[in-house]
Regions:
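Short pre-active-site segment immediately N-terminal to redox-active cysteine/selenocysteine motifs
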Residues: 60-62, 67-70, 252-254, 259-262, ...
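Thiol-/selenol-based redox modules, centered on thioredoxin-like
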Residues: 161-234, 337-376
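N-terminal, post-signal-peptide region of Sec/Tat-exported proteins
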Residues: 42-90
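Conserved redox-active cysteine motifs that mediate thiol-disulfide chemistry
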Residues: 67-80, 258-275
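Short, internal strand/loop/helix patches
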Residues: 115-159, 167, 302-337
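Thiol-based oxidoreductase modules, predominantly thioredoxin-like and allied folds used
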Residues: 92-117, 132-142, 284-298, 310-321
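Bacterial Sec-dependent N-terminal signal peptides
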Residues: 1-25
Length: 376
């Protein structure tokens, strides 16, 4: 083996070892033990204020709950946390919720039970939508607070006494489905602390969504690469085909967008439809696009769809009379592009929009529909 080959072999293995070390080199969170002091923090709330442990210095009991916008289990407990906060506020109990997931580590494929991600801006929307009566704090992507407390899943509740010593760590209650539990485990722990007693049990296991630690972003990148590699196609569709599409003989909620490459608003908003499709495609949902470009412009339409990585069902209207398309889609449609429909099986129109959509509104409609839902 010559010297040059030896040199490059050594370099190759050196970089390989570095890469392996970087993959394995991440903090291993350990759950805070009973009796330990609450780690301090300095976090921004959805109300714009900065909170630290000292912000709750007068609390007779401090409840810290690690939660997440996107998590079905966490969402199932939101109303219970609001009710629990209202019940104990007058007793000197402070309740705080912290969102600690790393947003780059959350794939769109994990957002099938929500209208929102876990970013700070999305937290503000959830805080307002649900009228949270407790501070909702953002741990940011460095996750320092979560690493200090070591939550197992979301939601994970911690109860500290007046001296900020941990007395309880675990679940809120044993019944995830809304309406089947009232936060019994957490309430019992708070009652015990207020009475100067030790909660029994002091710890429980925690069922919920795994924490999205920053080192998990590799999985998100793998999913993005998988989507990018999926084939994109566009097929001709006639007036009759459009009628059948709108009638929706499937067992899925169907979102249809009518667009064209020459329509500025259409091409500007198309990425939002891809996001929506990737969020809900594992649920009883499908996204379909229909191009109104001339049939001879089919390749141009396909080129655009490939740029968008639109691996959903795509069609181009192949009949000559565009007005028949308009009537086939929706007699109420006046003809301006873009046009969007959300259809139940059987063709009932849940939502229609002439002009650009509001993506958040569409997501709320989808996840709020009885066929989809926010909970398992």
């Amino acid at each position: 083996m010559n010297i040059k080959r030896i040199f490059f072999t050594v370099i190759f293995f050196s970089f390989s070892l570095i890469a392996m070390a970087q993959k394995a080199d991440h903090p291993m969170p350990v759950t805070l033990a009973i009796g330990q002091s609450a780690p301090d923090f300095k976090l921004k709330g959805t109300d714009g204020k900065i909170y630290s442990l000292n912000s709750f210095s007068k609390a007779k009991a401090l409840v810290i709950i690690f939660s997440a916008n996107h998590c079905p289990t966490a969402q199932a407990y939101e109303d219970r946390i609001v009710a629990l906060t209202g019940k104990y506020k007058a007793m000197g109990v402070a309740v705080v919720s912290i969102s600690s997931n790393s947003t780059p580590a959350i794939s769109l494929s994990e957002l099938g039970y929500t209208d929102l991600g876990d970013s700070y801006q999305d937290m503000i929307i959830r805080y307002r939508d649900k009228k949270f009566n407790f501070p909702y704090l953002y741990d940011s992507d460095d996750q320092k607070t979560a690493l200090a407390y070591g939550p197992v899943a979301t939601p994970h509740a911690y109860v500290f006494d007046a001296a900020k010593k941990l007395q309880y760590s675990g679940r809120i209650d044993a019944s995830e489905k809304p309406g089947t539990g009232n936060g019994e485990d957490l309430s019992n722990a708070i009652d015990a602390v207020l009475s100067g007693k030790s909660p029994n049990p002091a710890t429980t296991k925690v069922f919920g969504c795994s924490m999205k630690w920053s080192w998990k972003k590799e999985l998100t990148e793998q999913q993005l690469n998988k989507w990018a590699a999926m084939p994109v196609s566009i097929n001709n569709i006639t007036e009759q085909g459009v009628k059948e599409l709108v009638h929706n003989n499937s067992k899925k909620l169907r979102l249809i967008n009518i667009w064209a490459t020459w329509c500025g608003p259409c091409t500007m908003e198309f990425a939002d439809f891809i996001t929506i499709d990737r969020m809900y495609q594992k649920r009883d949902f499908e996204f379909v696009s229909i191009s109104t470009d001339k049939p001879e412009k089919k390749e141009k339409a396909l080129e655009f769809l490939k740029e968008q990585q639109a691996a959903n069902k795509n069609f181009i209207y192949s009949d000559s009379d565009i007005y028949k398309l308009i009537e086939a889609v929706d007699p109420k449609w006046q003809g301006a592009l873009p046009y969007t429909l959300l259809l139940e099986p059987g063709g009932k129109i849940v939502y229609s929009q002439q002009g650009p959509i509001n993506p958040l509104r569409i997501k709320k409609m989808i996840v709020g529909h009885q066929m989809i839902g926010r909970y398992y």
